[in-house]
Amino acid sequence: ADTIVAVELDSYPNTDIGDPNYPHIGIDIKSVRSKSTARWNMQTGKVGTVHISYNSVSKRLSAVVSYSGSSSTTVSYDVDLNNVLPEWVRVGLSATTGLYKQTNTILSWSFTSKLKTNSIADENSLHFSFHKFSQNPKDLILQGDASTDSDGNLQLTKVSSSGDPQGNSVGRALFYAPVHIWEKSAVVASFDATFTFLIKSPDREPADGITFFIANTDTTIPSGSGGRLLGLFPDAN
């Protein structure tokens, strides 16, 4: 199975697998059962921003979700990613819909990782930034139903020609280049990721959610990982 670390924006509470009984953001370490969650006042039809950061000194993974003009939601969890992830990974975004649905539209996405060592070549870093997504992106690996549209947005799950969300959809987008996320001799390994998103839904209860995730480089969508498993996990263990 893939090794996954993720930050989830979970719009639909699945209390049977340990979700709190409200929309929430959470940090997932190798399981969809979040290690830490915070209540998320989700606003459909409004653009939101997610900022995720980690550094190996504090060993704290944290995420902040905000909408302009309203208060933000923060979640964090202390974890040593050296002990969880392989040295080389890919970073991606995933989303799913189920019986209930929502658009999982990504408007922009940026990422920076840095490895500081004591050697001569002091810093090894990777940076990318998408402010618009091209129609046939060469620098993204699109999986499942993910596609880019003529407006320059990334649609992680299926939408109709009129832009309405479709049910039972799963899609992911990964940056094409592997990321050197940690190294034995690194003094500090850190990363920052930011993305903006738009969730719209005709349903009273939108579903299912969007994630930012880090995984082994050959990661694929696990069979049966739709809906509440957010395109990341084969089961709810």
Curated annotation (Swiss-Prot):
One annotated GO molecular function: calcium ion binding
Its biological purpose: D-mannose/D-glucose-binding lectin with hemagglutinating activity towards rabbit and human erythrocytes. In rats, induces dose-dependent paw edema. Has low cytotoxicity against Artemisia sp.
Annotated binding of Ca(2+), by residue: D10, Y12, N14, D19, D208
InterPro entries xref list: ConA-like_dom_sf, Lectin_LegA_CS, Lectin_legB_Mn/Ca_BS, Legume_lectin_dom, Leguminous_Lectin
Record keywords: Calcium, Hemagglutinin, Lectin, Manganese, Mannose-binding, Metal-binding
Assembly information from the UniProt record: Homotetramer; dimer of dimers.
pH-activity dependence text: Optimum pH for hemagglutinating activity is between pH 5 and pH 7. Activity quickly decreases outside this range.
Record note on temperature dependence: Hemagglutinating activity is stable up to 50 degrees Celsius and is lost after incubation for 1 hour at 80 degrees Celsius.
Family: Belongs to the leguminous lectin family.
Designated name of the protein: Lectin
The record's account of how the chain is modified after translation: Concanavalin A-like lectins of the Diocleinae subtribe undergo proteolytic processing referred to as circular permutation. The propeptide is split into an N-terminal and a C-terminal part, the gamma and beta chain, respectively. These are then religated in beta-gamma order to form the mature alpha chain. The beta and gamma chains can often be detected in cell extracts. Residues 1-118 of the mature chain, as displayed here, probably constitute the beta chain in the propeptide, residues 119-237 the gamma chain.
Chain positions recorded as a carbohydrate binding sites: Y12, N14, G98, L99, Y100, G227, R228
Amino-acid positions noted as binding Mn(2+) in the UniProt annotation, renumbered to this chain: E8, D10, D19, H24
